[in-house]
Amino acid sequence: GKNYSASIIGIDNNTDIAVLKIITDNKLNSIEIADSENIKVGDRVLAIGNPYGIGISVSNGIISATGRDYGNPYLQLIQTDAAINPGNSGGALINENGNLVGINSKIFSKTGAYQGIGFAIPSNLIVQIVSELIQYGKIRTTWIGNFRVVRIRVNLNNKIVNALKVIEIDNFGPLYEKGVRENDIILEINEEEGTWGNLTKSLRFAGLGNDIQ
């Protein structure tokens, strides 16, 4: 490998993703980024990393699940059974075409070693984070008021769907000013299902002053 000098453009502590500017006159090749919305359970993937510092290696697996929050609803992680061990964090999760579908992030383990459950940050979220860091040097936060919701399932046109019920809301802030009140039910958020994950994702990357539908 080669060593390069670099400067830090921005860091997102929530995902442990940073944008670096590499200082070089050489032409650098970039990886193709896949649309993580198109991945399916069962798709084959490869996890690249440096487990335990022994050197760059690749492990083989499949997409086990998508939309896992694993304690952080902002992330909606990809779950994979490709071996991810300490040292793999920050490595690429690629599909069979060699395109980036995620960045290896963490594992579920009672021993600290690989037990078949690993997680990666999806590529679409990475693009959002990187774009924000390049433009602003940080992830800007948004606020729509103080409120509490509970997850519910409702029958909508003979179809059971996920939704959020507002159980408490302060009488100030953007959400209240738009007419949201206690016992209101949120069915969709920006044309996506009314789930806590979609709500927090919309809040995280809504531009300041932009509307959330």
What feature does the model see in each segment?
Residues N183-I186:
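Conserved catalytic motifs of ABC-family nucleotide-binding domains
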Residues G1-N162, I167-F172, Y176-K178, I189, ...:
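Serine-dependent protease modules
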Residues D211-Q213:
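Short, conserved beta-strand segments of beta-strand-rich sandwich/propeller modules, principally
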